[in-house]
Amino acid sequence: MASEITVAGGGIFGLACAWELTRRGRKVRLFEADRIGAGASGGHVGALAPHAPENWNDKKQVQLDALVAATDWWAEVGAAGGVDPGYARTGRIQPVAPGAEARMAERIRAARAHWPQWAGMELTERPQAALVPVSPSGLWLVDRLTARISPRRAGAALAAAIRAQGGEIVEGQAAPDAPAIWATGAAGLAPFGGNGVKGQSALLALDMADAPQVFADGIHVIPHADGTVAIGSTTERDVLDRRTDEQLEAVIDKARVLCPALADAPVIDRWAGIRPRARSRAPLVGPWPGRPGHYVANGGFKIGLAMAPAIAAMLADLMLEGRDRIPPGFWPKLRAGG
C-alpha cells in the first residue's frame, strides 16, 4: 500500500474513512469533485436512530455498535478540529397506534435482549418532553439510545479534524483513477447495482435544542442545537432532480399536524438530494472486486450518518492490519456485467 491513501468523495463515508485513517497516523488526501457535503450528506435531518430490534442481524449489530460509540467518536472529531458537529444523545419519542400495544411490548423485549440496558425502550402515558407528537392511543414509545447530529456541521467538523491532523482535502476536483477508497455516493453505485433515491427535507426556526427527536407516521422531526428543527424526509425512487417541490410541502404540513408545537415555526431552508441505496440495502464496504488497491465505502442510504464511524473503522482495520470484521453481506459484489 502506498504511503499516502487517496479517498474519493467528501460525503459522510469518505470523510469518516479519511478521518479514521488520519487518526491512525496515515497520510490521507481526499478529493471531492464539488464541495464537502454537496450530495446526500448535506441535508438537515441527522437522525442517528437504531433499526427496530426485532429480527436481529449483522447490519443492526454494526449500527448499534456505531450508535453506542458515537458520543466518544464525535467528541474526538470536535476536539481535533475545533468544530462542533452538533451531536447529542437526546433520545426519541414515537406515538403508538391504537391496537399496537402488543407489538410494542415485543419490540421492548427485543431491545432488552440486544441493546445496552441504559438504552432500552419503554411505553409511557406521560412523556416528559417539550416536543410531543399527537398519539391517538394516548401512549408513546421512548428510547434513550437515539441521538442527533447536524449533517452539515458534521461534515465541516470532520474536514476540520482531517486538516488539523495533517490530512489534505481537495475540493472541486475529482479523484484520479488510481487506487483509492471510493465513497462517491449514488453515482458510484453503478458497478454494484443499486440506485439513487431522492429525499427532501426542511429546516424550521424553533429553539428546542434539548428535546428528544420525534418519529411519527414516517416523519422525522429533529431539534438541533442551533435553534432549528429539521423535518424530513421524502423517499422518491427513480427521481434524480435536486429540486424541492410539493412533496416536501406535504411533509412540512404533516409534521405541523403531528407536532402542534411546530405550527408557527417559519421554514428557513429547503433541501433535496440523492441518497445512495445499494442493491443489498446494506452498506457496501471492502475491496473493489477485480481492482487491486481499490476499496468501496458506499450505500449509506438513510443510515449513513449513523453507520459511518463503524464503516470507517472496519475498512481501516482491513486496509492497515489485514483484520476483516466486515459482515459478509456488506462486501461489494459486481452486478451482472458490471
Specify the residue positions occupied by each region the protein language model found.
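Active-site substrate-recognition segment that forms the wall
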Residues: A16-R24, G46-A47, A52, P85-Y87, ...
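Residue-level detector of alpha-helix initiation sites
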Residues: G11-I12, R35, K302
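C-terminal catalytic lobe of FAD-dependent flavoproteins
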Residues: P266-G338
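N-terminal Rossmann-like FAD-binding beta1-loop-alpha1 element of flavoenzymes
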Residues: S3-R29
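Dinucleotide-binding Rossmann-like beta1-alpha1 core, especially the glycine-rich loop
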Residues: G46-A129
